[in-house]
């Protein structure tokens, strides 16, 4: 299930575009997630009171969390699959403290793909989308394996 060097290059090329403006990318990813899957909002005490897109756009906490999410994901992607050290604490907190099911990781992955398609159509063609999907699937599978080790059935 690993990615080729060429696929990792496609992933990291488009991720460079994300890093040029992490706050707006992160905010848009979370807003898409929450609008498309309102049940995910319930896992976030800081955001669950936000009902409208305007309220979400105005929330500094939501923007900060978007930065946190995409910064962590960027660190993982840059490891090109050698991300054990990064995955372990992330899985620990998401399994034991936040109780985020793997399904929600799938949903946020979909939101990430949609935001990249929307913001970077010229840099995110079919090959790049396929590579990013594989990279996000690798991340989710490794998170799920850690969840299992921790006894979390998420």
Swiss-Prot record:
Binding site for nitrite: 65
Modified residues (Phosphoserine): 4
Positions of the Globin domain: 2-148
Entry annotated with the keyword Transmembrane helix: no
Record-listed Phosphothreonine modification sites: 68
GO biological process terms, semicolon-separated: removal of superoxide radicals
Gene3D superfamilies attached to this UniProt entry: 6.10.140.2100, 6.10.140.2110
EC number annotated for this UniProt entry: 1.7.-.-, 1.11.1.-
List of residues binding O2: 65
Catalytic activities: Fe(III)-heme b-[protein] + nitric oxide + H2O = Fe(II)-heme b-[protein] + nitrite + 2 H(+); H2O2 + AH2 = A + 2 H2O
Binding site for heme b: 94
Protein's cellular compartments: Cytoplasm, Sarcoplasm
UniProt xrefs under InterPro entries: Globin, Globin-like_sf, Myoglobin
Annotated family: Belongs to the globin family.
PANTHER family attached to this UniProt entry: MYOGLOBIN
Function: Monomeric heme protein which primary function is to store oxygen and facilitate its diffusion within muscle tissues. Reversibly binds oxygen through a pentacoordinated heme iron and enables its timely and efficient release as needed during periods of heightened demand. Depending on the oxidative conditions of tissues and cells, and in addition to its ability to bind oxygen, it also has a nitrite reductase activity whereby it regulates the production of bioactive nitric oxide.
Subunit structure: Monomeric.
Name under which the protein is recorded: Myoglobin
Source lineage: Eukaryota, Metazoa, Chordata, Craniata, Vertebrata
């Amino acid at each position: 299930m690993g990615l080729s060097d060429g696929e990792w290059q496609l992933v990291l090329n488009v991720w460079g575009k994300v890093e040029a403006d992490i706050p707006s990318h992160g905010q848009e990813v979370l807003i898409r997630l929450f609008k498309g899957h309102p049940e995910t909002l319930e896992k976030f005490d800081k955001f669950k009171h936000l009902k409208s897109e305007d309220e979400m756009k105005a929330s500094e906490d939501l923007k900060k969390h978007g930065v946190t999410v995409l910064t962590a994901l960027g660190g993982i992607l840059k490891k090109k699959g050698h991300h054990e050290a990064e995955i372990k604490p992330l899985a620990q907190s998401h399994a034991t403290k936040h109780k985020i099911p793997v399904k929600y990781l799938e949903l946020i992955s979909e939101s990430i793909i949609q935001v990249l398609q929307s913001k970077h159509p010229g840099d995110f063609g079919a090959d790049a989308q396929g590579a990013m999907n594989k990279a996000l699937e690798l991340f989710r599978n490794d998170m799920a394996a850690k969840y299992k080790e921790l006894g979390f059935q998420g």
